[in-house]
């Protein structure tokens, strides 16, 4: 029973070496595994049981490795599903109205060719392939209402040799003739006496009751001088010195 299990292990390792081709020591490990799995002559049954357990473990490892190898393939498939190429749909533009644009471009090309044929004299003559009055740039000009021209009144021309500005001319026109000045009028000849007039109010009347209005400034000094003249000292002030 041990020999077929050892052969299955050998086949497993050989297939792994063929697939990966990375491990350089693959043949050496395969030979060691062969020597390890083959039981010697006259070996007990325990050795065969251990070999069978090893073969079962090898099968489990093979299944795990095969499952791991399947996972990257699934991941690659998912990535391929995510990166989908975008295909642009073809749109039919035959229903669009592009004929007018094409016709206008053809007209412009024809005009340009005519202009080149005629040469530089074509501009001097003033020729043009299209009618300027029918262009879109003249629509606003036609819509505008005619502006009425403002007629200014001519200014009166003075024959005199003195120049007068417009402000002086207007003032001269509105000025009225005046007679001689009135000497006795307060408006034309104001006096200082008019500003010096004192208007009595109620407060001034109350102040007159409490205070004495002094009209003469030198009256107090005259009274003091009279009193001093009456108080004369007739005694001899030096008599005290003679007694000593």
Swiss-Prot record:
Keywords: Acetylation, Cytoplasm. Residues 131-144, 185-194 have a biased composition (Polar residues). It comes from the Eukaryota. Residues 1-144, 156-207 are annotated as: Disordered. It is found in: Cytoplasm. The modification N-acetylalanine is found at residue 2. The keyword Ribosomal protein does not apply. Belongs to the CDV3 family. PANTHER family: PROTEIN CDV3 HOMOLOG (PTHR16284:SF13). This is Protein CDV3 homolog. It comes from Xenopus tropicalis. The gene is cdv3.
